[in-house]
């Protein structure tokens, strides 16, 4: 159990050692603010928005894989001019005890004074003494300047109790803590309360998307100076997705005609496809992968139409879950969805390679469903 010893509250001293509750050394790379590559594009419109994080207890930067979340927050943190406690989370952490051991060490590394006597033992890494959370919150609440804590890849934390404990500390730390979550999914925190109280800063996928001007800057940093209309076309095709733009630029560097390449490249046979299939599709269970491949034959779809293509009565919850995960499934409202255009293109190629002959059958099923539901023009399209 991660615990706190009974000492006078006024005592100060080294709060954490240099080993985690299992006796292994803390991985220092997890506390380092990530370095920005030479081709990184600073985006003042987003760093200005992030400045609001200093005035709200909670900030959430929520976007898809490769949306540029981490580098954006790293750039903001590096230019802040004050200490930032940074922790990159990992999926293999063994429960809340290990998480809080790393949080304490992140705060300690950033120079945040912590109560003496906080420590951990390897017997109970899945548990946290509530007194530790209360003492930490009380210590933070008494600070003149708030501690800034960035939790990167927060979506990797699976234990619901971790979110509950984090909410307890955030609530009771008051003005002494500014928490920034960088995540692919919405955390299990009472976000509605923070929104209603105007106590939350949010940056989401739509805002993270590159503008044509930002895309042109990124391309230029890769040695590609293209006309404005070419940058706009690439942004339209990629949806302004940061990783898609960067991977396209890297590939175009090898082409004798970069402008034509960026206009006509086959997404299904590119490094973009490799990224999406590994980072998005590969992380899903087999039934969800199958659903994604099957709905890729459609421009838009709802739960019932997806059920007709997959035979799965749980198609609706699967789609809603993909949307919450920022898994390149976009909510059109009224229970209709669509795939990110580039993602849909790649899935279509993957479907034809994996299941030759299935695509025409899926089109027939979709047409039957659409006719039965009065959507004849779409069925004939």
Predicted feature locations:
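Walker B catalytic acidic pair
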Residues: 152-153
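Conserved catalytic network of the ASCE P-loop NTPase/AAA+ motor domain
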Residues: 52, 138-143, 170-176
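Alpha-helical sensor/transducer elements of the RecA-like P-loop NTPase core
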Residues: 2-12, 16-25, 29-33, 42-46, ...
